[in-house]
Amino acid sequence: MKAVGVIVEYNPFHNGHFHHLNETRQKTDADCLIAVMSGNFLQRGEPAIVSKWARAKMALAAGVDVVIELPYAFAVQAAEQFAHGAVQLLAAIGCQELCFGSESGEISAFLSAAKTWLEQKETFDSLIRTGLARGQSFPKAAAEAWQKFGAAPLDLSKPNNVLGFAYVKAIWQNKLAMMPRTIPRLAAGYHDESFSHPSIASATSLRKTLRQTGRLESIAAYVPPATLEQLRQYRETYGRFHDWEVYFPLLKYRLLTATEADLRRIAGVEEGIEHRLKQHIAHAETFAAFIAAVKTKRYTWTRLQRLCAHVLTNFTKEEQAKAANPTYIRLLGMSEAGRRYLKQVKKSAALPLVARASKLNGDSLYEQEKRAAAVYAAAFPEPLYSAALKEEYATAPIYVSGIERK
């Protein structure tokens, strides 16, 4: 069976994601589509709108055959480390190709950019560091660095391109036998906050609309029925969706009771940012107001969100340094085709394939995952808190037969 990988967050799964899956299967002739998916906290440092289990069900209903989890130590990171963990997991489970969305859908631009970067890595990275030190954003610093080598083959101001570039670099750096492919994204931009197309919208705009209206009907045109049903069930069970504001009291407690020395141990706390965190936390009444007060050119909103997630989960620089590579493949769900594929590769997979969380106790990556799960569940009062926490430890991989797919 030919396995093809996708790297996803599905926050939530929408029609653009559905298009990506269909195009991926069609262009690659995949027998098995494998999604490596961030868990309860995401690459930009946000809590996922619903749990990884609810999002895995959305993915399986839409045609994904296997869903595996990207551990927190790689999921809540800048593009390079995020990509490093994700492509290694897909390679370990036997994916022959990786297919990602991009602005142009032309893989040649990514290959050309990666080749130039590999040949000029030291110079390129030095130029980026210089730009960042001057207070530039990463896209701006990268664009200026490319100009030193002639015209940039990629527009690195676009998030999909930044991630795609990181995926190709990670495949080459790790010498993985996995071919990268790309397809053009549809209509809505990654961060678009409004609806500009009758059926395609960004996950950002969907979450914003849900926050503003509270009505699932307001996003019905932009998501498959299975997504709507999972969102409905989740809110019915737990009473709410997740966003940063619900965690702000917990973050405030952590920052007010931590010393600056404590904060300097946390991953992402550099260049004296701990002073600004302590300076502004007492007076901020919302998470959004707090980040707006703390952010600088160097410390962007996204970077601060990741840092705050690390503060909540107590993810330290020492733990980050030790998290060099994934150590296991955690299975979240599978279709019948996925079950057959996993049976075929179980003995040949490069990492242990784990279905039960209890088997991972003691693994340093999973110990961090447990802390993230404890924080994520803190959005709810008891007895819902304990129920959500139990889901992390007791849930077996989801199985979806062909009949159940919508």
UniProtKB/Swiss-Prot annotation:
GO biological process: tRNA modification
Keywords (A to Z) from UniProt: ATP-binding, Cytoplasm, Ligase, Nucleotide-binding, RNA-binding, tRNA processing, tRNA-binding
Annotated EC: 6.3.4.-
Catalysed reaction, written as an equation: cytidine(34) in elongator tRNA(Met) + acetate + ATP = N(4)-acetylcytidine(34) in elongator tRNA(Met) + AMP + diphosphate
Domain of life: Bacteria
UniProt family annotation: Belongs to the TmcAL family.
Protein name: tRNA(Met) cytidine acetate ligase
Organism in which the protein naturally occurs: Geobacillus kaustophilus (strain HTA426)
